[in-house]
């Protein structure tokens, strides 16, 4: 399992418990984190294999994962379970994510210095073997997937427009609730004037 999905030993232990549950429901685990604090929070990001996830899907995952964790009890204290989608400016945690989001801007951090730096920002150019390709100012470079400590999409107008268009085309958007979506998809910067 990639350390980008589950970083700490506890995260990895819990991921090993819940991944089969999530996959049996027809979803994929994108990221899992136990956030410490006064009251710990277990954050799970999941999606359908083809991408996307709805509130009902999150509730279904939450119910099944809760049942498993109640039996296994990997977190000693009381905690809050949060199940969500990866969001538009999603983390990139699996090698396939870097192929899915080719052309979109991303921020990548490495565990060690690579050519004097740890942070890279640029357009994703896919993968080649076990390397993630990213176009930076100096040109396209390859970073071994195992070198990555963090990676996520950068929220840009193009990303928002394309994700909304994809959701609309897939019938996942109720246009009656979001009248500014067509304007955004069409490339206009201003939402329609309120005529009420």
From Swiss-Prot:
Keywords: Cytoplasm, Ribosome biogenesis. The gene is rimP. This is Ribosome maturation factor RimP. HAMAP family: RimP. It is found in: Cytoplasm. Required for maturation of 30S ribosomal subunits. GO terms for cellular component: cytosol. It comes from Dinoroseobacter shibae (strain DSM 16493 / NCIMB 14021 / DFL 12). Belongs to the RimP family. The keyword Membrane does not apply. Its main location: cytoplasm.
